[in-house]
C-alpha cells in the first residue's frame, strides 16, 4: 500500500490530502486516490493511497489496486502516516497534525485534546523512530512530559503492514506530580510522603530445594526467570515437561504476533552464557567496540558461544553489528540446528548484557537445586 505521493511536486502523506484528491505516484507517475481508514474484520487498515488504474503491470493481490508498481513508501513516511491514521481512528474528537512545533521540538505526529484529560494530559506526541538512533530519548520525553503531553515512542517493530501498536504510550499523569524539592505549600502529610526514605536493604536468601520442587508441574513448561533485553523482547530460562532446562529468546513481531526459539542447556553452558554477556558489555557497548575500519563490511561478529545442549541438536548464540560503518545497533541471534537451521534475532539495548549475566547466575542456581 503506498503511503507517499506527489501533489504539485511536493511530497504528501495520506492524512495531508483530502478525500477525492488525485496525487501522483513518485515511482511510476500514475494517479493515485485516497483510501480512508477502515476495518477489515478485526484488522485495522490505515488511510493510504491506491493507484486509480491498477498501476503498471498485472496486479499485486486482491483488493490492492496497485498493479505491478514496484515503488515502496519510504519507511519513516509510512510509519508517520499509519500512526496518524490510528490516532485519528481512536480519538476522533482530537486535533492531529504532522510535524507541528511544540515549544521547540517537532514530533512526527501531534495529537491535542479539546481539554486535558486523564491519563494523557493535553495530548500525545508521537516519535516514529526509524534508523535515527542519535536522538536523546530521555531529553525528548522529558520535554513533552514537562509540557503535559504524553509520549508514544514508536520503533519499527511496533508496526504491522497497515497498523501500529499504541499500547506503550507513556502517559502524563504518573509523571505530573512535583518532585520533592517543589512541595512548598502542600500539607505536612504530603511533604512527609515526598521526603527522602532510607535505602532499601537487599539480601540474598537461598531457596530450599523442597520449595523449588513444590512448583513442579508435571507435563507443563515452567518459566524460571525472564529478563528484558529490548523493548518487547526478552531472554528466558524454563524447565520442560521432561525436566530439562532451556534458554530462549523471544520478541513481539507486530500486532498480536511473536517469535521465539528455545535450546536445551547443561551446567557447562552457564559459563558460556556469562562470558557472552561479558563480551556484549565490552565489545558492543563498551570501550572495546571495534572501529568501522576494524570491522567486516557487513554483519561483523562480536561474539559467539556454542552451547553443549543435547546430542542431536547444535545450538549457539552470536552478537554482531549489521552495518559497522554507521551507528549500528547490536543484533543478538540464537541459533538451533537439527535437520534445518532455526534462529531468532533481535536488536538489543545496552542493559541486555547485565540482564543476560543475571540469567546466567539464576541458571547456575537452578542447576544446583536440581542436583540437590
Swiss-Prot record:
Top-level lineage group: Archaea
Compositionally biased spans, kind Gly residues: 55-70
Region: Disordered, residue numbers: 49-72
Name used for this protein in its record: Uncharacterized protein Hlac_3024
